[in-house]
């Protein structure tokens, strides 16, 4: 997320716009109330990277006619420009990778239940595994938060079960960090005894000390596309209905996934 924000800041700066960064999920009534002075004052447009499926901010900005682009996520609100990956496909790719390595006991430690990224990635994984012959009831799924603490607590419950998973799909790379810490605490060797895959390919994922297998998002393209969409909207250069940009993903296999060994 930090890289995305830096790239967005650069893109808008080059176009002559002043950028204000709001560190808030902005997905409840109190957040909407605190944002109103900004909306009423000088807000020309907004790039929203933390929207929930029913975000009141999205509805309010649409009602007021303020240009808005959602990145990474989508909402239930129609008529909003979005720039994201196909998260259902991304979840399926993570499941396919683990299944082809021989894993059959696969668990999902996801982010919030009210975000499209978590819901879609989980659905993609479950659907692919179902098509491959696994029952949904045999694939443990727990929604939590996009934090390492959440990944840790969810994974501790997974790994303490009678038949623990041999592979865990983490909702993002930050959750995966918690999964790895839980495995370490339980004395489980990654990837020999447990394979772990995340999403996003954060800079830390490629560290030689971590080597996290992950699904990479094209963050640079995402930032450029979102900035261009919003700038065009703010300048009145587009009047067509909402555009939904779906960007490609890439499986980056590193050191946290391996062949299942009985």
Q: Whereabouts are the PLM-identified features?
A:
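Periplasmic-binding protein-like
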Residues: 42-50, 107-109, 141, 162-172, ...
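Conserved functional loop/turn residues at catalytic and ligand-binding sites
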Residues: 42, 65, 102, 133, ...
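Flexible loop/turn connectors
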Residues: 156-262
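Alpha-helical recognition/docking segments in bacterial nutrient-uptake
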Residues: 1-96, 160
